[in-house]
């Protein structure tokens, strides 16, 4: 069942009052104060087209992009070491996030570390096979000498 708001592409404060809907006292939603198109009307289109249609501006008529730059200075930022860049990627907040499963040990790892993970597994297998083949060759040599 869809609500009345989801079927109406735009809903302003006047439209809400015209339908008999009551606004809460002193706590009206920001979208009721100005006409904003519903994102559902822009399904399958880029967000930029919705932003252009909505003409979103801050209350002091500063664009949202500029406000974001100013507000970004006060945000807390966690810095990552350059040595860990192969683990987290260049821009972790913007990079796509994928996980892969190692078929040898069923461990879930990020693709960035999968090669080193397999390298460690291969190295441990090689060391085991080298020591086994070394012992086997010693036994073969001893049998030939007898």
Swiss-Prot record:
Which superkingdom?
Eukaryota
User: Where do the segments described as Disordered lie?
Assistant: 1-27, 125-146
Composition bias type Polar residues, residue spans: 127-138
Question: What InterPro entries does this protein map onto?
Answer: Ataxin-7-like_regulator
User: What is the protein name stated in its UniProt record?
Assistant: Ataxin-7-like protein 1
Q: Which organism was this protein described from?
A: Mus musculus
Organism ancestry: Eukaryota, Metazoa, Chordata, Craniata, Vertebrata
Q: Which gene encodes it?
A: Atxn7l1
């Amino acid at each position: 069942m869809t609500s009345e708001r989801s079927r109406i592409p735009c809903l302003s404060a006047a439209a809400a009052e015209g339908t008999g809907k009551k606004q809460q006292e002193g706590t009206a939603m920001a979208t009721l104060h100005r006409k904003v198109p519903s994102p559902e009307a822009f399904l399958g289109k880029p967000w930029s087209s919705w932003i252009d249609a909505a003409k979103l501006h801050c209350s002091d008529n500063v664009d949202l992009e500029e406000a974001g730059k100013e507000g970004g200075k006060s945000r807390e930022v966690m810095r990552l070491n350059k040595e860990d860049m192969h683990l987290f990627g260049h821009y972790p907040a913007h990079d796509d996030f994928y996980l892969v499963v190692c078929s040898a040990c069923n461990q879930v790892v990020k693709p960035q570390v999968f090669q080193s993970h397999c390298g460690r597994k291969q190295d441990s297998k090689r060391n085991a096979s080298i020591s086994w083949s070394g012992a086997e060759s010693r036994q073969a040599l001893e049998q030939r000498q007898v």
